[in-house]
Amino acid sequence: FWSENTHLTVGGEEITVRAGSYVRLCRTFTAGESILLKLDMSLRAWAGEERMAGKASLFCGPLVLCADGYYDGRLNVEQLPALRAESLKLLRVEPSGFAGSTFTLECGGETLTLCDLYTAGSSGSAYTTWLPMTGIAPKPFARSNPFRLQKVGV
């Protein structure tokens, strides 16, 4: 559902992939053949409702991003600045000191380093997946978008 722009190459042959569906590979592979899967890693957000109103969970592809002071020492997860959904820009993704990655974003001329949910809190630090965000409204549930995600950023 989230990967609208997926590319799959099997043994050098491009395979058509439709968002929200599975691809079945029925073939005999030969030594040295490879499968290359490129997923849509654009930024998306899930707007919070009720007690999470005014906040959103941010995704980079299938990965949930988190604010964790260990990865960005300027962050206090209890007092995060509000991000503007329309101005978010992913600058870079780098391996973290653990098994996951860090994601450096720009928003309104400021940078912010987030981590993936897998490594969040692994140093014993506090973290949150719900980030204060403006310019985003909740989307209703739909079978075509069960996670109610929407593209954000530039």
Briefly describe each language-model feature range.
Residues 1-11:
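Beta-strand-rich binding/interaction modules
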Residues 22:
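Active-site-adjacent structural elements in folded domains
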Residues 10, 16-18, 27, 34-154:
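C-terminal beta-rich recognition modules with glycine/proline-rich loops and embedded aromatic residues
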Residues 2, 29-31:
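Short loop/turn positions at the edges of beta-strands in beta-sheet-rich folds
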